[in-house]
């Protein structure tokens, strides 16, 4: 049962992941939006249907997710934007959160120098200065074609009229209710015992979005909305000031770009670790011709795990905010360096993470998240990953504004060598400093094949984002899968420390698990979980699109068929 609706005399099909296989074979897709929620995908495709571009649809989709996907969609967080124009120009915008001006390197340590549990993850002191709204206006000023008022109005209507709670969302609300109440009190909006099928109306969010609609960027970063934010952060122990908000600016950055066989891959540069890490992984596996092995075979998993292990080790030492630290990008992606990194790989036994230190290089002078992918009929493409960091961020809910604030400060290294909430270890390169951007794993990525747009891909998943994007691209271009099949396929993950291979539960043959263990791999079945929720679009040689919306969530694709 596809849902069809008509906008501007164009027939549009809204497809849940379980319906994609029913797409008529005689119909070709010319535009698509794939996101974490049906409502957001539908709003995004409606913007394309009325003549907007992928950049217009990006803004509308993002704002819709802020309403109906509050655990990660946001105006109180930040994100990364990767784009490719129809004529092949590629760029990125960094609207990652920043540390407040009052932040300090040891702000989460006790008098003995130990990390205070929960201080960087829960409550006002965990909140970084939000960048989402500034990012959306920056994108609109450079690339938008429709009025901003047109792009924000569907989200205002969605907040005011309400969205329907799904079963997965109801479970999510319930799982965090205790923390919502602890920080915000019993009457807070998302502590109200919602069940699947209930409608959530958020009038406060509608009013906030109207302020942004009417006053532009200043509607969030100054005036009553900003004052409400600062007061709520202060009341819950935080240090963000009005000056922090007024001084926030996004940054256009040069993307990470590397080649793998006949693919040209663009991804986010630091302060994202994603582009460098997948660049390292692809180049480390390239000599092994993964396509000769069956998908998720012992051999393929061995090679990929060992590449993941070594890349995450480098991540821990070298990566941070390029505006504050020098990052040896070229050296980290140098093929000779990466060949040396893989030289210790042994088919007969697992490497030990204790033996795999971050590499020695020559310096040269760069968990809960949501991703969406968009391609328009003109050939423009957008990959966006946006986040509050943990699910519902700091759990600080600005009641008068109707939105959650991030806990992005946890993505700094509170103390070198001590893992964050995702188990990732960092160094002084990612130490806290005033107005510094924290390191991220978000990996929005665009792939070209033989010079033409081929894939738009990304995922949430904290530390597993990088490996999920890596494996999804390989699933298509090495293992011959279609887009939905590649998204559905079981995933695995290794991040150097802890020294464990994480497998999605119930998805891998026990014989394969035993074979890995026999070679010395620690397969941490007790920690197995869903890994990533990939939303992606594949473009074939005739420029027809196919979509992959991850069934691990409530993700959905909305498409426009060719006439």
Which positions does each model-derived feature cover?
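Bacterial N-terminal signal peptides that target proteins for export
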Residues: 1-11
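C-terminal motif of bacterial Sec signal peptides marking the signal peptidase cleavage site
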Residues: 20-21
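Noncatalytic scaffold domains of N-terminal-nucleophile
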Residues: 25-42, 46, 54-216, 220-222, ...
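Active-site rim segments in enzyme catalytic domains, especially the processed small/beta chain
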Residues: 67-92, 239-241, 381-449, 479, ...
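Short beta-strand scaffold segments in enzyme catalytic cores
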Residues: 73-74, 78-85, 370-374, 444-446, ...
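Internal maturation/activation junctions in enzymes
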Residues: 287-388, 397-401, 416-417, 425, ...
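Extended C-terminal subregions enriched in glycine
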Residues: 436, 478-529
């Amino acid at each position: 049962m596809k849902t069809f609706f008509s906008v501007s005399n164009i027939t549009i099909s809204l497809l849940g992941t379980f319906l994609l296989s029913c797409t008529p074979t005689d119909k070709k897709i010319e535009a698509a939006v794939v996101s974490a929620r049906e409502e957001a995908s539908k709003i995004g495709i409606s913007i394309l249907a009325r003549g907007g571009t992928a950049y217009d649809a990006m803004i509308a989709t993002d704002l819709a997710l802020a309403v109906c996907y509050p655990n990660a969609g946001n105006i109180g967080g930040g994100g990364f934007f990767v784009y490719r124009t129809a004529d092949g120009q590629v760029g990125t915008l960094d609207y990652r959160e920043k540390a407040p001006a009052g932040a300090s390197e040891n702000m989460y340590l006790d008098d003995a120098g130990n990390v205070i549990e929960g201080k960087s993850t829960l409550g006002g002191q965990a909140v970084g200065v939000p960048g989402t709204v500034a990012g959306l206006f920056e994108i609109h000023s450079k690339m938008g074609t429709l009025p901003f008022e047109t792009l924000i109005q569907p989200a205002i209507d969605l907040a005011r009229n309400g969205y329907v709670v799904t079963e997965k969302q109801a479970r999510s609300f319930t799982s965090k209710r205790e923390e919502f109440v602890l920080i915000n009190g019993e009457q807070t909006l998302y502590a109200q015992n919602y069940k699947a099928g209930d409608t959530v109306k958020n009038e406060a969010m509608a009013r906030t979005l109207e302020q942004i609609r009417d006053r532009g960027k200043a509607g969030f970063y100054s005036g009553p909305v900003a004052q409400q934010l600062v007061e709520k952060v202060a009341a819950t122990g935080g240090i963000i000031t009005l000056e922090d908000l007024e001084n926030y600016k996004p940054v256009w950055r040069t993307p990470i770009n590397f080649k793998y066989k006949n693919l040209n891959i663009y991804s986010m540069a630091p302060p994202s670790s994603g582009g460098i890490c997948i660049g390292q992984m692809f180049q480390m596996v390239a000599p092994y011709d993964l396509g000769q092995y069956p998908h998720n075979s012992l051999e393929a998993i061995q090679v990929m795990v060992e590449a993941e292990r070594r890349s995450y080790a480098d991540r821990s030492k070298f990566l941070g905010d390029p505006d504050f630290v020098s990052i040896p990008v070229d050296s980290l992606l140098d093929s000779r360096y990466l060949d040396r990194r893989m030289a210790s790989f042994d088919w007969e036994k697992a490497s030990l993470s204790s033996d795999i230190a971050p590499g020695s290089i020559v310096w040269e002078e760069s968990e809960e998240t949501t991703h969406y992918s968009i391609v328009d009929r003109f050939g423009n493409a957008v990959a966006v990953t946006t986040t509050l960091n943990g699910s519902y961020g700091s759990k600080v809910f600005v009641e008068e504004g109707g939105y959650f604030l991030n806990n992005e400060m946890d993505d700094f290294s509170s103390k070198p060598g001590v893992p964050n909430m995702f188990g990732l270890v960092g160094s002084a390169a990612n130490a806290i400093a005033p107005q510094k951007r924290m390191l991220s794993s978000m990996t929005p990525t665009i792939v070209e094949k033989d010079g033409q747009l081929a894939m738009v891909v990304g995922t949430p998943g904290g530390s597993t984002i990088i490996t999920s994007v890596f494996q999804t691209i390989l699933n298509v271009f090495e293992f011959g899968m279609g887009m939905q099949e590649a998204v559905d396929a079981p995933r695995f993950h290794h991040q150097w420390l802890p020294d464990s291979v994480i497998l999605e539960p119930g998805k891998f043959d026990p014989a394969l698990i035993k074979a890995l263990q026999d070679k010395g791999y620690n397969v941490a079945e007790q920690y197995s979980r869903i890994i990533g929720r990939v939303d992606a679009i594949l473009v074939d040689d005739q420029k027809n699109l196919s979509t992959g919306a991850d069934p691990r969530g409530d993700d959905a694709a909305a498409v426009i068929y060719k006439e």
